[in-house]
Design a protein with these regions (language model features):
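Catalytic glycan-binding domains that act on GlcNAc-containing polysaccharides
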Residues: 6-235
Length: 235
């Protein structure tokens, strides 16, 4: 077992991380009534409070990774707001990924999402320049440990987001996104690259209730929280 400060094949493990989303947090989110007048800090308030605190704690890292990868800080921050919290990380690491080593009818282990900013192992590996590489169980655990390190997690997500922008818009200034580009590139983080750009553009035009509108729901949520994320990042 690697300790913080050690190095594995993929990264140096840094112990300076935001507090993890715990079972207690998840139970307070799922089981405590969302009654603000009782000040229980449960329900959606528990989840959103954690998300905001995570971004605030890692503000300098988020802004630095965005600058290094020539993407807007609020774009990276909005993906983070969507991703952090939810299922405690040990569920994927200790239950889901081990089961996927043997249960052939489930998703492959490399499609397991790990890290506070949830990201599939295969996506992280592609950013590191090893697309399609098969990892041993030991290597999967090492990459998971890296994704559970905030600095690595933020950087690899920022690098992947730049790829998602350029996938549809190869000739643009990636530091300045229109609302459409913001929504579509953000939705690519969640939906991947299998679907053509025209489907996402049509999804943006679709009225509520149409099934294809779901293709851009992720990016729409990002756009709704954009002003709040900017404030958290001091932008």
């Amino acid at each position: 077992m690697l300790a913080m400060g050690d190095r594995n094949e993929f990264c140096s493990l840094d112990g300076n991380n935001s507090p993890k989303w715990s079972v207690f947090n998840a139970l307070a989110w799922k089981l405590t009534p969302d009654w603000q007048w009782l000040h229980l800090d449960g329900g959606q308030a528990q989840l959103m409070g954690y998300k905001r605190a995570w971004i605030t704690y890692n503000r300098s890292r988020i802004l630095s990774a965005a600058r290094s990868n020539l993407i807007p800080g609020d774009f990276l921050g909005c993906v983070i707001l969507n991703e952090v919290g939810g299922d405690p990380p040990w569920i994927k690491r200790n239950l889901v990924m081990p089961a996927r080593q043997y249960l052939f009818w489930t998703k492959p282990p490399m499609q397991t999402s790990e890290g506070a900013i949830k990201m599939q192992l295969q996506a992280a590996l592609s950013v590191l320049g090893h697309s399609g590489k098969e990892l041993s169980w030991k290597q999967q655990n090492e990459l998971t440990a890296c994704l559970e390190t905030d600095a690595f997690n933020i950087d690899v997500v920022a690098r992947f987001l730049r790829k998602m922008i350029l996938f549809d818009y190869p000739n643009i200034n990636t530091q300045t996104l229109t609302d459409e580009q913001f929504v579509i590139a953000g939705s690519r983080y969640n939906r991947g690259t299998a679907r053509p750009l025209k489907d996402f553009i049509q999804s943006l035009k679709d009225l509520p209730g149409k099934s294809d509108r779901t293709y851009t729901e992720y990016g729409r949520a990002m756009l709704r929280h954009r002003a709040e994320v900017k404030a958290l990042l001091g932008l």
